[in-house]
């Protein structure tokens, strides 16, 4: 418990002290309300007509990790006094990119390699920096990529334990090793996977794979996981941070031709929907979000069934991005109640 919380509890025996504390807190909050003045957004290339960039709509795609990262972004922004509205679980990139372009969304968690494949299927960048540069060359002028996080989560071709055993596949095997056996395998993934370069199109053109059939499921979620476990599909597109891979002894095949590219987590924003303060906040999040932390949080959400919002807040606090204090509104409520004790 913080010293703030301790002092507020001890004041129950001294109503006068509680009144002073409450008055001081109200004064402090009033002063802080003026800390984010309109001057903060002057000459700000990211701020615009949408409440000065301080009324932010954070969206997410239709899978668990995207929702989790959106919660991380949103709670970090809220801690800086920015009003946040969540629009979770919207759908695929084909939908959310358009919503960003028209300003319906302000912020969206993205994966740089997949975004580039969507914008330019022929691009073959060799580094994170060249990936970002290639995206910027194709990105709509109303949008902006912020800093990439060290955290990566790639699409993959993953097989179940039975398939791995049957065809002698291990974690050292590659997607290319499926060429002769793919005609016997059903692959499952999101509906969009069927027509994406980072999907069946690329698996055929880059690796020469022709699967027996394709089963439309979800984006690496419970439907795909269950189908792979039950052998309804023998191969699937799972995200490499998916905790069920280890739990179910699935085998992720290597991607030596880099079809799935770099997949750093990276905020994509609508320029007029986010202030510089908001951009700086998200860049601070990206600086601390690594793959180890993302794996841990994914396991908490997907295996332990924890609320992603709670998981997001806990990580932000541990990373020093949320104040380890009682929230001001909670403090006022506590102090206000204690005045009546």
Language-model regions: role of each:
Residues 128-186, 275, 287-291:
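A conserved helix-loop-strand patch within extracytoplasmic ligand-binding domains
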């Amino acid at each position: 418990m913080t010293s703030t919380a301790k002092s507020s509890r001890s004041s129950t025996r001294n109503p006068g002290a509680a009144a002073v504390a409450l008055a001081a807190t109200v004064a402090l909050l009033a002063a802080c309300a003026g800390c984010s003045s309109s001057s903060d957004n002057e000459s700000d290339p990211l701020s615009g007509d949408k409440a000065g960039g301080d009324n932010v709509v954070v969206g997410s795609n239709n899978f668990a990790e995207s929702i989790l990262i959106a919660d991380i972004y949103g709670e970090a922004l809220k801690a800086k006094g920015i009003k946040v509205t969540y629009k979770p679980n919207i759908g695929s990139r084909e939908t959310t990119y358009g919503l960003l372009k028209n300003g319906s969304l302000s912020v969206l968690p993205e994966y740089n390699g997949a975004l580039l494949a969507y914008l330019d299927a022929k691009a073959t960048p060799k580094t994170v920096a060249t990936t970002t540069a290639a995206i910027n060359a194709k990105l709509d002028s109303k949008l902006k990529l912020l800093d990439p996080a060290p955290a990566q989560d790639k699409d993959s071709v993953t097989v179940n334990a039975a398939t791995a055993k049957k065809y002698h596949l291990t974690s050292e095997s590659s997607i290319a090793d499926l060429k002769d056996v793919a005609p016997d395998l059903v692959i499952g993934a999101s509906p969009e996977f069927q027509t994406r370069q980072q999907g069946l199109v690329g698996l055929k053109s880059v690796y020469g794979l022709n699967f027996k059939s394709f089963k439309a499921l979800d984006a690496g979620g419970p439907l795909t996981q269950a189908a792979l476990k039950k052998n309804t599909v023998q191969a699937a597109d799972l995200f490499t941070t998916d905790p069920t891979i280890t739990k179910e002894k699935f085998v992720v095949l290597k991607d030596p031709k880099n079809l799935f590219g770099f997949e750093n987590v990276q905020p994509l924003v609508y320029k007029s929907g986010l202030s510089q303060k908001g951009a700086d906040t998200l860049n601070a999040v990206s600086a601390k979000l690594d793959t180890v932390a993302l794996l841990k949080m994914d396991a908490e959400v997907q295996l332990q069934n924890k609320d992603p919002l709670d998981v997001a807040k806990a990580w932000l606090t541990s990373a020093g991005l949320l104040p380890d204090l009682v929230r001001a509104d909670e403090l006022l409520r506590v102090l206000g109640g204690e005045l009546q004790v």
